[in-house]
């Protein structure tokens, strides 16, 4: 009788331990799943790729291959990679660099935007750009919200008030071979500080994302009318190498201000 009681007690304790083990495994799995975007949430993120002469082989690599994408092609060279997640390939005239492409996408898709739009240049094969773009996607996935990887300044307009450029050459080798021009078409209003004042009325912002790599929440885009973006793109429609593109690079936070749905993370 005593042996039977001991046996029953052992079975009971073993059952409790087994239950606790299975509960912990189940809890860990669910916590892990909640920390990352599920497939449905990944479909709410779209990559907008501004391509000129790059091969875009990276588009099939992890983590880029997790997300739907649209490619805007600005050259006659159509020899580049797409992926099963590519929803469209759009040909555009070669004006305005990537900045024009980004505004064009917003204008054309104003009523059909993804919850999070991630803007990438085609040159993510370059190590510095690849590292930043991969981190951006990882931060979006981990934080489950839009993220802006950036450098922080006390006041962007004041920091870059006198900034202007007379020459600039594409940093990607394939792009510079196809288009070796380095003379910039000067902005009608310059330097940056005056241009910024004209566009954004001296709005104070503190964050800048370089390399044309950043993302925006749909709500932040739609809080401004389509005409807001239609007016801004005019500065980028007449030249393949506009100085204004470098001004926009420093002013994207003003374009979408306030970015209240976004987590700012300094690089």
Per-range role (PLM):
Residues 1-3:
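Juxtamembrane low-complexity tails/linkers enriched in Ser/Thr-Pro and polybasic
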Residues 5-267:
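ER/Golgi luminal nucleotide-sugar-dependent glycosyltransferases, focusing on the catalytic module
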